[in-house]
Every structure is written in structure tokens, then in C-alpha cells.
């Protein structure tokens, strides 16, 4: 780490033993060890932070949205120009280019696309389960003829007199 050899460490320990004394040497060695551990953890966390910021920077560079937007617009312009050339060359109607140039979407107001499907009409009266189709048609004929009422005796002249 500090490029210190084994002999140099022994020389430093002998000098520290003479200066500090044998009684306080274990306590100082513990404090130096704690300081070295904190220093290593700090250096490792700084390396991780620099790697994280470098990764974030790489992601931002790869996601350069403005450049991608410009590329997409240039492709769109190229396609529009090519389509115009083909349109002029083959004499295609102007209605085909309408989706590119239209400001408002066209509405399909009178077509089948706007009409909702109609629901089938269900009979409102309940029929008895014993009736057969033949008897039910005869009954409907009877009811339809009996529903027709006779003309009333009142005339428009008599209603005006009252």
C-alpha cells in the first residue's frame, strides 16, 4: 500500500517502542489499526462513488435524446421527400398525402365505422310455454284485428259545437 518493506516496519516499531514506551504501545497500535481501517473504508467508498458517477455519466451519454430526436426527424423528412417524388412520378392523387399534411384528423361521419350495432328487439310479453308457433300466430292475428277500433261517432263538426 505505502510501498514499505518488512525491515522498514521493524525499524519504525523499534523507534515507536523507545518513544512511546512498552506500557502504551498496545493502545497506540490499536488506535493506528482503527485509523488505517477507517482510511481504507473511506478510500473504497470514494472509489465506489466515482464508479457510480462514471456509470451515470455513461448512461446519460448513451441516452442522448436530443440527438436521437434529430435523427428521427431527418429520417421522417427523407421519407416524406421520397414519398413526394414517388407521388409526382406516378401521378398519385393528393388524397394519399393528406395524412402527412393534414392538421386535423378526418372524421368518418357518414360511414359504417361510426354506427353502433343495433341490438335485437326482445319480445316484451311473456308467452306461455304450452303455446305452439301455430297457435301463437293465430292469437296475434286475432289481437291485431280486435285492436282496430271502430270509427267514433263524433265528427269534427260536433266537437266544435261544445
From Swiss-Prot:
It is found in: Cell inner membrane. HAMAP family: TatB. GO terms for biological process: protein transport by the Tat complex. The Tat system comprises two distinct complexes: a TatABC complex, containing multiple copies of TatA, TatB and TatC subunits, and a separate TatA complex, containing only TatA subunits. Substrates initially bind to the TatABC complex, which probably triggers association of the separate TatA complex to form the active translocon. GO terms for cellular component: TAT protein transport complex. Part of the twin-arginine translocation (Tat) system that transports large folded proteins containing a characteristic twin-arginine motif in their signal peptide across membranes. Together with TatC, TatB is part of a receptor directly interacting with Tat signal peptides. TatB may form an oligomeric binding site that transiently accommodates folded Tat precursor proteins before their translocation. It comes from the Bacteria. The chain crosses the membrane at residues 1-21. The gene is tatB. Residues 86-162 are annotated as: Disordered. Keywords: Cell inner membrane, Cell membrane, Membrane, Protein transport, Translocation, Transmembrane, Transmembrane helix, Transport. Residues 123-135 have a biased composition (Low complexity). NCBIfam families: tatB. Coiled coil: none annotated. Residues 108-117, 147-162 have a biased composition (Polar residues). Belongs to the TatB family. This is Sec-independent protein translocase protein TatB. PANTHER family: SEC-INDEPENDENT PROTEIN TRANSLOCASE PROTEIN TATA, CHLOROPLASTIC (PTHR33162:SF1). InterPro entries: TatA/B/E, TatB. It comes from Hydrogenovibrio crunogenus (strain DSM 25203 / XCL-2) (Thiomicrospira crunogena).
Amino acid at each position: 500500500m505505502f510501498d514499505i518493506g518488512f525491515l522498514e516496519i521493524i525499524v519504525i516499531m523499534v523507534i515507536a517502542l523507545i518513544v512511546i514506551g512498552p506500557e502504551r504501545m498496545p493502545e497506540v497500535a490499536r488506535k493506528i489499526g482503527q485509523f488505517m481501517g477507517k482510511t481504507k473504508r473511506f478510500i473504497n467508498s470514494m472509489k465506489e462513488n466515482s464508479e457510480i458517477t462514471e456509470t451515470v455519466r455513461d448512461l446519460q451519454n448513451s441516452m442522448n435524446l436530443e440527438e436521437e430526436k434529430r435523427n428521427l426527424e431527418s429520417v421522417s423528412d427523407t421519407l416524406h421527400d421520397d414519398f413526394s417524388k414517388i407521388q409526382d412520378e406516378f401521378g398519385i392523387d393528393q388524397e394519399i398525402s393528406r395524412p402527412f399534411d393534414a392538421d386535423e384528423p378526418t372524421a368518418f361521419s357518414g360511414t359504417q365505422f361510426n354506427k353502433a350495432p343495433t341490438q335485437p328487439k326482445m319480445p316484451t310479453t311473456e308467452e306461455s310455454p304450452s303455446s305452439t308457433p301455430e297457435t301463437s300466430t293465430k292469437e296475434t292475428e286475432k289481437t291485431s284485428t280486435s285492436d282496430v277500433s271502430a270509427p267514433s261517432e263524433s265528427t269534427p263538426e260536433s266537437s266544435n259545437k261544445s
